[in-house]
Amino acid sequence: MRLSLLVTLALTALIEAHTVMVYPGWRGNNLITNETFPYGMQWMYPCGGMGTSRNRTYWPTTGGAVSFQPGWFRGHLQAQLQINLGYGTDGPDGGPPNMSNIMVKPFMLLGPTNNPYPGTVCLPQVPLPAGANVSAGDRATIQVVEQAQHGASLYSCVDIIFAEPGDPRIPIVNETNCFNSTQFGFAQIYTVTTQEPSLDVIASTTTGSAPRYYSWAGWLPLVAGAIWMAL
């Protein structure tokens, strides 16, 4: 398992790949650029051009770990990350009908360089979406979204089957598949609220002193010129 992952990462480095999912699994290797995908597969919504996996991974009904490697492509000195969940198999190719259920709201990743870089991001306890009601045996898809600096997004997915916590079929989380590399920083995304201009302020700028100010401003160059000629 670890050997196959190392081989995948080596190939990734050669072809400037994108986001590699480490835990709980990966829908499949979509690190491909060819005539069919001239810009690369991972830019394609919802799962980077990969069809639904027939070999699903078990994941706890109470939420669990998600880890991935975000820096296998240029332009990710800063990136916006988000994790979503799609329920069921009623959508295209036996997958979810949509990926609109947010598990982790957008946050900023601060990378060490704008060139490709190694390193892992681990979220040890990703919660289920608000209002989620899942049972053991239900099927779903976890979607990791990485928005690059130029605005386009990369998509990677893992197809899961929910299982009760402690189920031996759930892959073990340990320090080799879920850790945060020290060269990464993180930041929250926030909004700035602007105040609507007051009508009183607008009125005060259209009457009274404002016209006189601009009137004097118009005369100032002429006055300055006259003083200079007198000297």
From Swiss-Prot:
Keywords (A to Z) from UniProt: Cell membrane, Copper, Disulfide bond, Glycoprotein, GPI-anchor, Lipoprotein, Membrane, Metal-binding, Signal
GO molecular function: metal ion binding
Disulfide bond sites: C47-C157, C122-C178
CDD domains (UniProt xref): LPMO_auxiliary-like (cd21176)
Topology relative to the membrane: Lipid-anchor; GPI-anchor
Propeptide: 203-231
Cofactor(s) listed: Cu(2+)
Cofactor: binding comment: Binds 1 copper ion per subunit.
Annotated GO CC locations: plasma membrane; side of membrane
Entry keyword Transport: no
Glycosylation sites: N34, N55, N98, N133, N174, N180
Residues carrying lipid (GPI-anchor amidated isoleucine): I202
Family statement drawn from the similarity comment of this UniProt entry: Belongs to the X325 family.
Role description: Lytic polysaccharide monooxygenase-like protein that has diverged to biological functions other than polysaccharide degradation since it does not perform oxidative cleavage of polysaccharides. Acts as a cell surface-bound protein that functions in the copper-accumulation pathway. May also act as the major cell wall sensor that regulates MAP kinase-dependent hyphal anastomosis, the fusion of hyphal cells.
PANTHER family: COPPER ACQUISITION FACTOR BIM1-LIKE DOMAIN-CONTAINING PROTEIN, HYPHAL ANASTAMOSIS-7 PROTEIN
Name of the protein this chain belongs to: Lytic polysaccharide monooxygenase-like protein X325
Gene, per the UniProt record: X325
